[in-house]
Amino acid sequence: MLPVIFFTVMAISVVIAFLARTGLKNMTVGEFLVGGRSFPAWLLYFLAVGEIYSIGTMIGFPSGIYAKGASYGIWFLGYILLAYPLGYFVAPLVWRAGVRYDAMTIPDVFGRHYRSRGLELVTAVGVLVALVPWGQYQFIGMQVVLGALGLSISPVQGVILAGVMAFLYLAVSGVRSPAFVAILKDSFMILGIVIAGIAAVVATGGIKETSGPQAVPHALVTMSGSPLVFAMTTIVVQSIAFYLGFSAMYLFTAKSERAVKSSTVWMPLYMLMYPFLVAVSYYALEAHPNVKNPNTIFMVATKGLLPDWLVGVVAAGAGLSGVLVLATTALAIGGVVSRNLVPNIRPESQRRWATVVIAVFLVAAAVLTLTGSTLMLTILNLVYYLLAQFVPGWLALMFFKRVQAWAVGTGLVVGIVASIVLYILNPSLGGVNLGLVTMLLNAVLTFGLSYLRPGPERLPMAQWTRGQKDVAERDVAQPVRD
């Protein structure tokens, strides 16, 4: 019964992906990548929360609490909560940049604002470096879900299934497919989390018995020293990077600034599901204390709490979460390669190129997952170390007039290289998040070099309105359109 429910829901999601194209006669690259900038607030909302509350919510969050204790749960919750008020003010500026430069990718914005093909290329490579481990993150989660189904399929077959579904989502409807599938995904994800959380509380005899000192070791729910410093600094860096990293692409799909703000207002409601996840995590600490792979703990606990058919519901929510974000990640990479990395591709050919790149990325990320799987929240940290490196460039184009393109590029390159080196070496630094260190280094280079040698004046996004051009912008060729 469990596999039947799981695969039925997956099949329904593919049908929804095909139906998402209804009414579209010509799938231009603009429709494919950013939905023609036509998404109303409600559709942007589902696309956005589909990205935010991914398989990391169901699989990675409990695994972090189970393996590392309270500090992982606190920073995971804290950075999302802080990101929303920041996003209410910052996200509309990202959308403005997309409209101003007819941008469909982050490199589009950086290259056109700073009038630098070199910076566009550097940004494109940086985005690719950041998004590949993010794709691996989704594949690892899918492996966990498929393994929990008890089917006689290998890890290779599992990642192939996830990759094929993600490709089908995108090949027919582009970004519209993930947007509409997100509605189905959210329904099953929330239902699965709530059911599992309630079952955990009932199984332990009540809330006090689930989270009280007799059930959860004191060391797992208290922080001091380095873990506390890590949690606080992680909240800061990841909340800042939240809307200035991979979230930019889905913001480009909105029809207006008002749609962006309206969708952001209601996103915190999804945080109500986290107490249920905490309940499952605490139940697992007592009921399953010796699980070797922490990534599996949510599904292990769920299988011990629920009948097979309800486990199928939970697994369907987790599976859709992984495939959905995997699809949007692949779409972002396809857009970057076809529009920014490979030169002189005609607009009418960019969609075909993007589709090919999507397929190549899915294969590459699957291979990386099979050969280098690790704890999910560890990979999440690496992703945010890398995404944080785009923050200085975004802040410069939003609020500053005379930042140099080469200074932004220098800061970006140094920040990315430093992030990878520090991730490999893993120095303690007193618990300070390594992404914060590298982001500050990046910012010092970006703004310090520009202070020493100011660039031409450019109107920042915070002061820009439609139809307005600054002096530097008048000399820029019009961006390529569909």
Question: Which ranges hold each PLM region?
Answer:
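Membrane-embedded helix-loop-helix hairpins and adjacent transmembrane boundary segments
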Residues: 1-482
